[in-house]
Amino acid sequence: MKAILLLSGGMDSLVTTAIAQQAGFELAAMHVNYGQRTMQRELNSFRAICSHYSIQQRLEINADFLGKIGGSSLTDLSMPVSVANLESHAIPASYVPFRNAGFLSMAVSWAEVIGAERIFIGAVEEDSSGYPDCRKIFYEAFNRVIELGTKPETHIEVVTPLIALKKWEIVRKGIELHAPFAFSWSCYKNEGQACGVCDSCALRLRAFEQAGMEDPIDYETRPHYIDC
């Protein structure tokens, strides 16, 4: 069975790739450039991960309209990337409004063309930034949208294997599957050394600490988030 990976190049999409490959799917990978600060580094990670897993069928999409819409510190350079507060329950400024719905729509279009029946996305609801389009209920609803909005003979399902996992469990799963974490990129701010203090870096560093593992990428600073 053919499956599409929505592969950002981050640690969650990397581990999702490892899971899908282990499950025996014929993989095609999609990456979306949307004007984010770390666009080139994420694209490099996407290509490295695809090469590692010998994924030949790839689609790189330019969706810079999300940057033009704005509203996120990932795409609007006038908005600072905030320092992580892992105790906060507020949705951070890094949230890109309704981004995942747009990504999924493009993936469904491609799936119809190439005959893929599954779309894998590394969304995480537990132990995450709290983005509304990373909730299980959102993906359940989107699967209904796919059912209603595609041809009767089309059967495409969005799969979220990490949705209920803690971040440290994702790290452990990646280690178990020999996922190349050194190829992945999570920082919202930098393309050279990861900053270590943005929300995404903090969640990643805490996850590796809780898993008892050393994160292989370079950081400007490595705060300890184990008590956060």
Curated annotation (Swiss-Prot):
Pathway note: Purine metabolism; 7-cyano-7-deazaguanine biosynthesis
Binding locations of ATP: L7, S8, G9, G10, M11, D12, S13, L14, V15, T16, T17
SUPFAM superfamilies to which the protein is assigned, alphabetical: Adenine nucleotide alpha hydrolases-like (SSF52402)
Cofactor note (record): Binds 1 zinc ion per subunit.
Cofactor(s) the protein needs: Zn(2+)
Pfam families named in the record: QueC (PF06508)
Keyword set, alphabetical order: ATP-binding, Ligase, Metal-binding, Nucleotide-binding, Queuosine biosynthesis, Zinc
GO BP annotations listed: queuosine biosynthetic process
Keyword check for Oxidoreductase: no
Binding positions for Zn(2+) per the UniProt entry: C187, C195, C198, C201
MF terms (GO), sorted A to Z: ATP binding; ligase activity, forming carbon-nitrogen bonds; zinc ion binding
Key word Zinc present: yes
Enzyme Commission designation: 6.3.4.20
Matching CDD domains: QueC-like (cd01995)
Highest taxon in the source lineage: Bacteria
Cleaved signal peptide residues: none
Reaction catalyzed: 7-carboxy-7-deazaguanine + NH4(+) + ATP = 7-cyano-7-deazaguanine + ADP + phosphate + H2O + H(+)
InterPro entries in alphabetical order: QueC (IPR018317), Rossmann-like_a/b/a_fold (IPR014729)
Role: Catalyzes the ATP-dependent conversion of 7-carboxy-7-deazaguanine (CDG) to 7-cyano-7-deazaguanine (preQ(0)).
Family: Belongs to the QueC family.
Official protein name in the record: 7-cyano-7-deazaguanine synthase
Organism for this UniProt entry: Chlorobium chlorochromatii (strain CaD3)
